[in-house]
C-alpha cells in the first residue's frame, strides 16, 4: 500500500508518519510505503508523471498558492483512484 502525506510542517509530517507506523504495527501490514511531500506543487509534479498513491493525507492549509482543497480537486479531475484524508488544526474546517 502506498501512503502519501502532503504536509508543509515537519512536526505534523512526523506525527502522521508515527500514526501510520503504529497502525501498521497493530494491523501487521508489512507492505506499506510512505512518501512525504512538503508542498502541493511537489505532489502535483509527481501526479502529472502518472505516480500513484492509495491513500493520501493532505493538510488543508498548505503554504503557497495551492491549498489542500485545490490539490484534492486536481486529483479528482485526474480521475485518480485515491482515498483522501484531510488534516488540519483549524477549527473552521
Which residues does each PLM region occupy?
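Conserved acidic carboxylate
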Residues: 7
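Charged phosphotransfer/docking patches of two-component systems
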Residues: 10-17
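Acidic, metal-coordinating helix/loop segments flanking the phosphotransfer/catalytic sites
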Residues: 17, 32-55
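His-Asp phosphorelay/catalytic-motif detector in bacterial-type signaling
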Residues: 52-54, 79-83
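Active-site residues of response regulator receiver
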Residues: 58-60
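Alpha4 helix (beta4-alpha4-beta5 surface) of REC/receiver domains from two-component response regulators
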Residues: 66, 70, 90-93
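Short amphipathic alpha-helix used as the core "switch/output" element in two-component signaling
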Residues: 67-80
Amino acid at each position: 500500500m502506498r501512503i502519501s502525506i502532503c504536509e508543509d510542517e515537519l512536526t505534523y509530517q512526523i506525527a502522521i508518519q508515527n500514526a501510520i507506523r503504529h497502525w501498521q504495527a497493530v494491523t501487521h501490514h508489512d507492505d506499506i510505503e510512505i512518501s512525504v511531500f512538503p508542498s502541493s506543487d511537489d505532489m502535483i509534479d509527481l501526479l502529472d508523471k502518472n505516480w500513484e498513491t492509495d491513500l493520501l493525507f493532505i493538510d488543508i492549509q498548505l503554504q503557497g498558492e495551492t491549498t489542500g482543497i485545490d490539490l484534492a480537486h486536481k486529483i479528482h479531475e485526474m480521475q485518480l483512484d485515491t482515498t483522501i484524508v484531510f488534516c488540519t488544526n483549524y477549527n473552521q474546517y
